[in-house]
Amino acid sequence: MKILLIGGGARESAIAHALKKNEEVKLYTLMKNKNPGIARLSEEIKLAKETDLDAVKEFAEKVKPDLAVIGPEAPLGEGVVDLLEEMGISAVGPKKLAAQIETNKEFMRNLFKKYNIKGSLMYKAFEEYGEELESFIDELTEKGIKAVVKPVGLTGGKGVKVVGEQLKDNEEAKKYAKEIFETGLGGGKVLIEEKLEGVEFTLHGFVDGDTIKFTPFVQDHPHALEGDEGSITGGMGSYSCPDHKLPFMTEEDVKLAKEIMEETVKALKEEVGGYKGILYGQFMLTKEGPKIIEYNARFGDPEAMNLLAILKNDFLEVCEAIVNKKLKDIDVEFENKATVCKYVVPKGYPDNPVRGEPITVDEEAIKKTGAILHYASVNEDNGSLYMTGSRAVAVVGVADTIEEAERIAEEATKYIKGEVYHRSDIGKKELIKKRIEKMNELRR
């Protein structure tokens, strides 16, 4: 069974490991940099930009895969699935039109409005800077609501800024909106939304167009520094619990979050003819219940590493059920284990990361800790590893309790050396307790 994998980060490393648990799988990977972990698992690799559709086509023609799995969002936004399907290759991932659920935040908000999906919020999209945009930000403030400023398109998870966090006040928010128009960031359109108060969590679903099968809930940590301080990143690490929900969630929260995603899948069927692949909802748990911050059209990174580490099924079976519309016929099951994932990143990340610096990873020592290792934004050159500026290496602890899973992941970070740092507080009970207290406070 030949599988074409597109992408070369830690998320794709987790996908590669999950696929290779099936001995029939032969992996062929197209990625931008040489990820040593993925390269080892692959029969053949091609180094090219994941958005270079000509390179994808050429590699697919050569390999003739039975199935393709798409890791990152950028190629989905370029229409890589449309291309592969035209070539007669089934792909786990949405077509360009359906991928807009991530690649076009205005499309996502309008979908919620049109189909009256629960968990929506106040928003307005703008094509140019002007009085209307300024007034909307001021109107939110008058209602006691802070503004969130987002480019409408893709920015690699780093374009969102919030008043009271990255933006000091409304004047800075307006200035940032202006900057988005001037630089063309994320397509140069701006979405202004209300800031939600609460605790963030994520939920993934495997979708075949009709059926959605859910994974455990995961909590990501987007802030760069301990205690949830610093710049917003692509995610510094994440954890999941043995009971598959999060400690600050009620059964009602679980039910509502799943209903929102089910309604979204139905709406996408009506609007664009269906969605297949992985759907990843990023939620804010507010005192009114879960609300959607945004959707992603693929696995979360880091969350894929938590989820695929405890998936009981043969992942190939799940992928085949997605493309063959057979998800209703299988049970997707996960072990009742806790997982903690921690990223080791270059110093200065995300604002001013060191690039091209060497990093050393003692794989044997990490293996002895019991942790799972995934290489991310590194490039292997002549046997040495160099950081390329984004998150470098991830380690995952899996155990019966969060405390033990956290200890395993933390122990493993000691064997990664270089101009690097990580958040040691992810998965620690003090930080989780803070989240529980925040939710209790809001619910009072």
From Swiss-Prot:
<dbReference type="InterPro" id="IPR020560">
    <property type="entry name" value="PRibGlycinamide_synth_C-dom"/>
</dbReference>
<protein>
    <recommendedName>
        <fullName>Phosphoribosylamine--glycine ligase</fullName>
        <ecNumber>6.3.4.13</ecNumber>
    </recommendedName>
</protein>
<keyword id="KW-0464">Manganese</keyword>
<feature type="binding site">
    <location>
        <position position="294"/>
    </location>
    <ligand>
        <name>Mn(2+) 2</name>
    </ligand>
</feature>
<feature type="binding site">
    <location>
        <position position="294"/>
    </location>
    <ligand>
        <name>Mg(2+) 1</name>
    </ligand>
</feature>
<feature type="binding site">
    <location>
        <position position="294"/>
    </location>
    <ligand>
        <name>Mn(2+) 1</name>
    </ligand>
</feature>
<dbReference type="Pfam" id="PF02844">
    <property type="entry name" value="GARS_N"/>
</dbReference>
<dbReference type="GO" id="GO:0009113">
    <property type="term" value="P:purine nucleobase biosynthetic process"/>
</dbReference>
<feature type="binding site">
    <location>
        <position position="294"/>
    </location>
    <ligand>
        <name>Mg(2+) 2</name>
    </ligand>
</feature>
<feature type="domain" description="ATP-grasp">
    <location>
        <begin position="109"/>
        <end position="324"/>
    </location>
</feature>
<keyword id="KW-0067">ATP-binding</keyword>
<feature type="binding site">
    <location>
        <position position="282"/>
    </location>
    <ligand>
        <name>Mg(2+) 1</name>
    </ligand>
</feature>
<feature type="binding site">
    <location>
        <position position="282"/>
    </location>
    <ligand>
        <name>Mn(2+) 1</name>
    </ligand>
</feature>
<dbReference type="InterPro" id="IPR000115">
    <property type="entry name" value="PRibGlycinamide_synth"/>
</dbReference>
<dbReference type="InterPro" id="IPR020559">
    <property type="entry name" value="PRibGlycinamide_synth_CS"/>
</dbReference>
<feature type="binding site">
    <location>
        <position position="296"/>
    </location>
    <ligand>
        <name>Mg(2+) 2</name>
    </ligand>
</feature>
<dbReference type="InterPro" id="IPR016185">
    <property type="entry name" value="PreATP-grasp_dom_sf"/>
</dbReference>
<dbReference type="GO" id="GO:0046872">
    <property type="term" value="F:metal ion binding"/>
</dbReference>
<dbReference type="GO" id="GO:0006189">
    <property type="term" value="P:'de novo' IMP biosynthetic process"/>
</dbReference>
<dbReference type="InterPro" id="IPR011761">
    <property type="entry name" value="ATP-grasp"/>
</dbReference>
<dbReference type="InterPro" id="IPR011054">
    <property type="entry name" value="Rudment_hybrid_motif"/>
</dbReference>
<dbReference type="InterPro" id="IPR013815">
    <property type="entry name" value="ATP_grasp_subdomain_1"/>
</dbReference>
<dbReference type="Pfam" id="PF02843">
    <property type="entry name" value="GARS_C"/>
</dbReference>
<keyword id="KW-0658">Purine biosynthesis</keyword>
<dbReference type="InterPro" id="IPR037123">
    <property type="entry name" value="PRibGlycinamide_synth_C_sf"/>
</dbReference>
<dbReference type="InterPro" id="IPR020562">
    <property type="entry name" value="PRibGlycinamide_synth_N"/>
</dbReference>
<keyword id="KW-0547">Nucleotide-binding</keyword>
<dbReference type="GO" id="GO:0005524">
    <property type="term" value="F:ATP binding"/>
</dbReference>
<comment type="similarity">
    <text>Belongs to the GARS family.</text>
</comment>
<comment type="pathway">
    <text>Purine metabolism; IMP biosynthesis via de novo pathway; N(1)-(5-phospho-D-ribosyl)glycinamide from 5-phospho-alpha-D-ribose 1-diphosphate: step 2/2.</text>
</comment>
<dbReference type="InterPro" id="IPR020561">
    <property type="entry name" value="PRibGlycinamid_synth_ATP-grasp"/>
</dbReference>
<keyword id="KW-0460">Magnesium</keyword>
<keyword id="KW-0479">Metal-binding</keyword>
<dbReference type="GO" id="GO:0004637">
    <property type="term" value="F:phosphoribosylamine-glycine ligase activity"/>
</dbReference>
<dbReference type="Pfam" id="PF01071">
    <property type="entry name" value="GARS_A"/>
</dbReference>
<feature type="binding site">
    <location>
        <position position="296"/>
    </location>
    <ligand>
        <name>Mn(2+) 2</name>
    </ligand>
</feature>
<feature type="binding site">
    <location>
        <begin position="140"/>
        <end position="202"/>
    </location>
    <ligand>
        <name>ATP</name>
    </ligand>
</feature>
<keyword id="KW-0436">Ligase</keyword>
